[in-house]
Protein backbone atom coordinates (compact mmCIF):
# COMPACT_ATOMS: atom_id res chain seq x y z
CA UNK A 1 0.00 0.00 0.00
CA UNK A 2 1.26 3.46 -0.85
CA UNK A 3 2.36 5.76 1.97
CA UNK A 4 1.93 9.53 2.05
CA UNK A 5 3.45 12.30 4.12
CA UNK A 6 1.18 13.50 6.89
CA UNK A 7 1.59 17.20 6.24
CA UNK A 8 5.02 18.38 7.40
CA UNK A 9 5.20 16.00 10.37
CA UNK A 10 7.68 13.59 8.82
CA UNK A 11 5.19 10.79 9.44
CA UNK A 12 4.42 8.54 6.46
CA UNK A 13 0.98 6.98 6.71
CA UNK A 14 -0.81 4.46 4.55
CA UNK A 15 -3.33 5.89 2.12
CA UNK A 16 -5.98 3.97 4.03
CA UNK A 17 -6.14 3.92 7.81
CA UNK A 18 -8.22 1.73 10.10
CA UNK A 19 -10.85 3.29 12.35
CA UNK A 20 -11.04 1.25 15.55
CA UNK A 21 -14.34 2.33 17.14
CA UNK A 22 -16.20 -0.91 16.52
CA UNK A 23 -13.22 -3.10 17.42
CA UNK A 24 -13.39 -2.42 21.15
CA UNK A 25 -16.36 -4.71 21.65
CA UNK A 26 -19.78 -3.92 23.02
CA UNK A 27 -20.31 -1.18 25.57
CA UNK A 28 -23.36 0.75 26.67
CA UNK A 29 -24.27 3.58 28.99
CA UNK A 30 -27.71 3.60 30.58
CA UNK A 31 -28.68 0.85 28.15
CA UNK A 32 -27.71 2.95 25.12
CA UNK A 33 -25.22 1.08 22.89
CA UNK A 34 -22.01 3.04 22.38
CA UNK A 35 -20.70 0.76 19.61
CA UNK A 36 -21.77 -0.85 16.34
CA UNK A 37 -22.03 -4.29 17.90
CA UNK A 38 -20.23 -6.93 19.89
CA UNK A 39 -16.98 -7.56 18.05
CA UNK A 40 -15.19 -10.34 19.92
CA UNK A 41 -11.54 -9.84 20.86
CA UNK A 42 -10.23 -12.63 18.62
CA UNK A 43 -12.09 -11.10 15.64
CA UNK A 44 -10.70 -7.65 16.46
CA UNK A 45 -7.17 -9.10 16.68
CA UNK A 46 -7.53 -10.70 13.26
CA UNK A 47 -8.79 -7.43 11.77
CA UNK A 48 -5.89 -5.46 13.28
CA UNK A 49 -3.32 -7.99 12.06
CA UNK A 50 -4.85 -8.34 8.59
CA UNK A 51 -4.91 -4.56 8.22
CA UNK A 52 -1.24 -4.34 9.24
CA UNK A 53 -0.18 -7.18 6.93
CA UNK A 54 -2.09 -5.46 4.11
CA UNK A 55 0.07 -2.36 4.52
CA UNK A 56 -2.12 -0.24 6.79
CA UNK A 57 0.02 1.56 9.34
CA UNK A 58 -2.41 4.27 10.56
CA UNK A 59 -4.82 3.27 13.32
CA UNK A 60 -7.43 5.71 14.64
CA UNK A 61 -8.84 5.11 18.11
CA UNK A 62 -10.09 7.15 21.06
CA UNK A 63 -10.38 7.17 24.82
CA UNK A 64 -14.16 6.94 24.48
CA UNK A 65 -14.30 3.99 22.04
CA UNK A 66 -15.81 1.11 24.01
CA UNK A 67 -14.79 2.98 27.16
CA UNK A 68 -11.08 2.60 26.33
CA UNK A 69 -11.23 -1.04 25.28
CA UNK A 70 -10.48 -0.20 21.63
CA UNK A 71 -7.10 1.20 22.71
CA UNK A 72 -6.34 -1.90 24.81
CA UNK A 73 -7.19 -4.26 21.98
CA UNK A 74 -5.12 -2.31 19.47
CA UNK A 75 -2.14 -2.42 21.83
CA UNK A 76 -2.48 -6.14 22.49
CA UNK A 77 -2.84 -7.06 18.83
CA UNK A 78 0.03 -4.98 17.44
CA UNK A 79 2.43 -4.51 20.38
CA UNK A 80 5.32 -6.18 18.51
CA UNK A 81 4.85 -3.71 15.64
CA UNK A 82 4.67 -0.45 17.63
CA UNK A 83 7.57 1.18 15.78
CA UNK A 84 5.99 0.33 12.43
CA UNK A 85 2.52 1.75 13.08
CA UNK A 86 1.11 5.22 13.71
CA UNK A 87 -1.49 5.56 16.43
CA UNK A 88 -3.98 8.39 16.30
CA UNK A 89 -6.08 8.83 19.42
CA UNK A 90 -8.58 11.42 20.54
CA UNK A 91 -9.85 13.07 23.69
CA UNK A 92 -12.45 15.60 24.72
CA UNK A 93 -15.64 13.60 25.06
CA UNK A 94 -16.47 11.22 27.86
CA UNK A 95 -19.36 9.10 29.11
CA UNK A 96 -21.93 10.68 31.40
CA UNK A 97 -25.51 10.22 32.51
CA UNK A 98 -26.90 12.75 30.03
CA UNK A 99 -29.96 11.89 27.98
CA UNK A 100 -30.51 11.11 25.15
CA UNK A 101 -26.82 10.92 24.20
CA UNK A 102 -24.71 10.00 27.22
CA UNK A 103 -21.56 11.93 26.31
CA UNK A 104 -20.18 15.20 27.62
CA UNK A 105 -17.45 17.44 26.28
CA UNK A 106 -14.41 18.60 28.22
CA UNK A 107 -11.64 20.20 26.17
CA UNK A 108 -9.87 21.69 29.19
CA UNK A 109 -6.10 21.45 29.30
CA UNK A 110 -6.26 19.27 32.42
CA UNK A 111 -8.76 16.83 30.91
CA UNK A 112 -6.85 16.51 27.65
CA UNK A 113 -3.60 15.74 29.50
CA UNK A 114 -5.21 13.26 31.89
CA UNK A 115 -7.02 11.55 29.01
CA UNK A 116 -3.75 11.30 27.08
CA UNK A 117 -2.09 9.75 30.13
CA UNK A 118 -4.84 7.11 30.42
CA UNK A 119 -4.62 6.41 26.68
CA UNK A 120 -0.85 5.92 26.86
CA UNK A 121 -1.34 3.36 29.63
CA UNK A 122 -4.05 1.46 27.73
CA UNK A 123 -2.00 1.58 24.53
CA UNK A 124 1.07 0.45 26.49
CA UNK A 125 3.26 3.01 24.76
CA UNK A 126 5.27 6.09 25.67
CA UNK A 127 3.82 8.16 22.82
CA UNK A 128 1.04 8.47 20.28
CA UNK A 129 1.82 9.74 16.83
CA UNK A 130 -1.17 12.07 16.59
CA UNK A 131 -3.36 13.35 19.45
CA UNK A 132 -6.65 14.93 18.36
CA UNK A 133 -9.56 16.76 19.88
CA UNK A 134 -12.54 14.47 19.40
CA UNK A 135 -14.73 17.41 18.45
CA UNK A 136 -14.30 21.11 17.82
CA UNK A 137 -14.74 23.56 20.69
CA UNK A 138 -18.28 24.90 21.10
CA UNK A 139 -17.14 28.44 21.80
CA UNK A 140 -14.20 30.79 21.79
CA UNK A 141 -13.99 30.44 25.57
CA UNK A 142 -13.73 26.66 25.27
CA UNK A 143 -10.97 27.11 22.69
CA UNK A 144 -9.05 29.40 25.05
CA UNK A 145 -9.12 26.72 27.78
CA UNK A 146 -7.28 24.19 25.66
Q: At which residue positions do the language-model features occur?
A:
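Glycine/Thr-rich phosphate-binding loops of Rossmann-like dinucleotide-binding domains
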Residues: 26, 69, 97, 138-141
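N-terminal binding-site loop/beta-alpha segment at the start of enzyme catalytic domains
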Residues: 1-86
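Generic enzyme active-site microenvironment
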Residues: 58-61, 88, 127, 132
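Active-site beta-loop-alpha junctions enriched in small/polar residues
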Residues: 21-23, 62-64, 90-94, 133-136
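P-loop/Walker A phosphate-binding loop and immediately adjacent motor/lid segment at beta-alpha junctions
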Residues: 82, 94, 144
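Glycine/proline-rich, positively charged
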Residues: 31-32, 99-146
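A short acidic, often aromatic-flanked loop/helix-cap motif at beta-alpha or helix-coil junctions
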Residues: 11, 95-96
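Secondary-structure boundary/capping motif
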Residues: 77-79, 91-94, 115, 119, ...
Amino acid sequence: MEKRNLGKTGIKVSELGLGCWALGGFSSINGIPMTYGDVQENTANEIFKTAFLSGINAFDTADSYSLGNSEKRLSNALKEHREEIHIFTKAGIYPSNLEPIPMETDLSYHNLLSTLDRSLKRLNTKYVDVFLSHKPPNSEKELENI
